[in-house]
């Protein structure tokens, strides 16, 4: 239930378990002008152990885990440096909003949330700092590659056309993966060594060794410390080289080595989800009258006038005639305020919330939005099978996510290639 709460602190170093800090802390690695200390590493190792236990995964060897955790901290540090260089900041109000969403998703209020965090040995301030770090990294990734992620209508149509010929293309796939990394421009020898390493791991798995433990020990992937668990993905979200494999795999099967841009991959199919169901939406036929302050009408006059119009309609005046006479939404005023049939999410939240709560043919009291004051009337409602449009929108989002993940991986690889990284503690090299 509280996986998301724990995960935030498992992802980032912070000082979540900083008891007994020493005045002089040993440096274990140098990353450009920054250092990673032994206390930071120890704190992250302890958090990773807790996460491994919570997910019922086999605990890897201590020395191997420390090496993997350090590599993770290096990646995080590089991205935090980029956030600082780009002047990216997170306001306290944004952190508050993020925490409220996490609490709500776990069916907790903020007081209960604090209690759960405290039970994990983490102070509220430290938890907020880790949330800030997570948001910073997300934002710097968006700034670095997000603007280049474009999915065209042609790409969506082409995917749907191709997927239509693939059996089980509408299913979801729960995968784990192990990544054996490659440099940006690997030599033939480096390619051979990485492929042999991946093949050796595959042989270990075939002989019965635990996939998740090997992912924690050996993978360079983003989800290595979670046992390589990618979660449940739609086919369109997966790299094409993965998608071609998974549709032919059986649950429990491991495939690879698969060559991708950032290295050789082993993938395990954990489970297959059900086929997407029909998507039915409620459309609303709605009309409105808009009054807003302008050069000729101060706010108090706008409020006074919209209330006066409301009273007249309640007394029997025709809504359409009043809209034509008074509404400042020119496009709909000529049609008696008619906005036509609207889909969920097309109108601003305050308007839509009131609209959805109205019985048919009942006019709302004045509603304030960013555009001004509205009187709203629902003329009719109907159910519409929106499956095709919904599927296209889903595919667009999945393709965007696929491109984003691949772009972030390439960007992270480039960051490492351009950075000065010195692992001072040779036991961790």
From Swiss-Prot:
<dbReference type="GO" id="GO:0006457">
    <property type="term" value="P:protein folding"/>
</dbReference>
<dbReference type="GO" id="GO:0043165">
    <property type="term" value="P:Gram-negative-bacterium-type cell outer membrane assembly"/>
</dbReference>
<dbReference type="InterPro" id="IPR023034">
    <property type="entry name" value="PPIase_SurA"/>
</dbReference>
<dbReference type="GO" id="GO:0042277">
    <property type="term" value="F:peptide binding"/>
</dbReference>
<protein>
    <recommendedName>
        <fullName>Chaperone SurA</fullName>
        <ecNumber>5.2.1.8</ecNumber>
    </recommendedName>
</protein>
<dbReference type="Pfam" id="PF09312">
    <property type="entry name" value="SurA_N"/>
</dbReference>
<feature type="domain" description="PpiC 2">
    <location>
        <begin position="281"/>
        <end position="380"/>
    </location>
</feature>
<keyword id="KW-0732">Signal</keyword>
<dbReference type="GO" id="GO:0051082">
    <property type="term" value="F:unfolded protein binding"/>
</dbReference>
<keyword id="KW-0677">Repeat</keyword>
<feature type="signal peptide">
    <location>
        <begin position="1"/>
        <end position="18"/>
    </location>
</feature>
<dbReference type="InterPro" id="IPR015391">
    <property type="entry name" value="SurA_N"/>
</dbReference>
<dbReference type="InterPro" id="IPR000297">
    <property type="entry name" value="PPIase_PpiC"/>
</dbReference>
<keyword id="KW-0143">Chaperone</keyword>
<dbReference type="InterPro" id="IPR050280">
    <property type="entry name" value="OMP_Chaperone_SurA"/>
</dbReference>
<keyword id="KW-0413">Isomerase</keyword>
<dbReference type="InterPro" id="IPR046357">
    <property type="entry name" value="PPIase_dom_sf"/>
</dbReference>
<dbReference type="InterPro" id="IPR027304">
    <property type="entry name" value="Trigger_fact/SurA_dom_sf"/>
</dbReference>
<dbReference type="Pfam" id="PF00639">
    <property type="entry name" value="Rotamase"/>
</dbReference>
<dbReference type="GO" id="GO:0050821">
    <property type="term" value="P:protein stabilization"/>
</dbReference>
<dbReference type="GO" id="GO:0003755">
    <property type="term" value="F:peptidyl-prolyl cis-trans isomerase activity"/>
</dbReference>
<dbReference type="Pfam" id="PF13616">
    <property type="entry name" value="Rotamase_3"/>
</dbReference>
<dbReference type="GO" id="GO:0030288">
    <property type="term" value="C:outer membrane-bounded periplasmic space"/>
</dbReference>
<keyword id="KW-0697">Rotamase</keyword>
<keyword id="KW-0574">Periplasm</keyword>
<comment type="function">
    <text>Chaperone involved in the correct folding and assembly of outer membrane proteins. Recognizes specific patterns of aromatic residues and the orientation of their side chains, which are found more frequently in integral outer membrane proteins. May act in both early periplasmic and late outer membrane-associated steps of protein maturation.</text>
</comment>
<feature type="domain" description="PpiC 1">
    <location>
        <begin position="170"/>
        <end position="271"/>
    </location>
</feature>
């Amino acid at each position: 239930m509280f996986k998301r709460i724990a995960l935030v602190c498992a992802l980032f170093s912070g000082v979540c378990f900083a008891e007994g800090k020493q005045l002089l802390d040993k440096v274990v690695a140098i990353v450009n002008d920054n250092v990673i200390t032994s206390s930071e590493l120890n704190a992250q190792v302890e958090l990773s152990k807790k996460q491994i236990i919570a997910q019922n995964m086999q605990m890897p060897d201590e020395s191997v885990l420390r090496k993997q955790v350090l590599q993770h901290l290096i990646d995080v540090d590089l991205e935090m440096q980029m956030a600082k260089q780009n002047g990216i900041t997170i306001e306290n109000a944004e952190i508050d909003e993020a925490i409220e969403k996490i609490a709500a998703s776990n069916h907790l209020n903020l007081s209960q949330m604090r209690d759960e965090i405290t039970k994990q040995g983490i102070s509220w301030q430290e938890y907020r700092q880790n949330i800030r770090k997570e948001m910073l990294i997300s934002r710097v990734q968006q700034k670095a590659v997000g603007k280049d992620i474009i999915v065209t209508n042609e790409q969506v149509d082409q995917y749907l056309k191709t997927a239509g010929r693939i059996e089980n293309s509408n299913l979801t796939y729960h995968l784990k993966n192990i990544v054996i990394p490659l440099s940006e421009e690997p030599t033939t020898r480096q390619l051979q060594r990485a492929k042999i390493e991946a093949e050796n791991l595959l042989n270990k798995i075939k002989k019965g060794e635990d996939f998740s433990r090997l992912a924690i020990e050996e993978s360079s992937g983003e989800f290595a410390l979670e046992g390589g668990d990618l979660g449940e993905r739609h086919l369109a979200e997966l790299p094409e080289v993965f998608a071609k494999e998974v549709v032919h795999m059986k649950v429990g099967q491991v495939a690879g080595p698969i060559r991708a841009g950032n290295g050789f991959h082993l993938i395990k199919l954990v489970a297959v989800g059900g086929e997407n169901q029909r998507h039915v939406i409620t459309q609303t036929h709605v009309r409105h009258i808009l009054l807003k302050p302008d050069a000729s009408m101060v706010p108090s006059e706008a409020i006074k006038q919209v209330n006066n119009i409301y009273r007249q309609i309640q007394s029997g005046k025709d809504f359409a005639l009043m809209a034509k006479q008074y509404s400042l939404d020119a496009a709909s005023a000529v049609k008696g305020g008619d906005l036509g049939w609207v889909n969920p999410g097309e109108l601003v939240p305050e308007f839509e919330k009131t609209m959805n709560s109205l019985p048919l043919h009942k006019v709302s009291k004045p509603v304030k939005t960013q555009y001004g004051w509205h009187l709203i009337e629902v003329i009719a409602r109907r159910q519409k099978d929106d499956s095709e449009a919904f599927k296209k929108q889903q595919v667009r989002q999945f393709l965007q996510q696929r491109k984003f993940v691949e772009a972030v991986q390439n960007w992270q690889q480039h960051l490492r290639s351009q950075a000065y990284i010195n692992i001072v503690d040779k036991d961790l090299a």
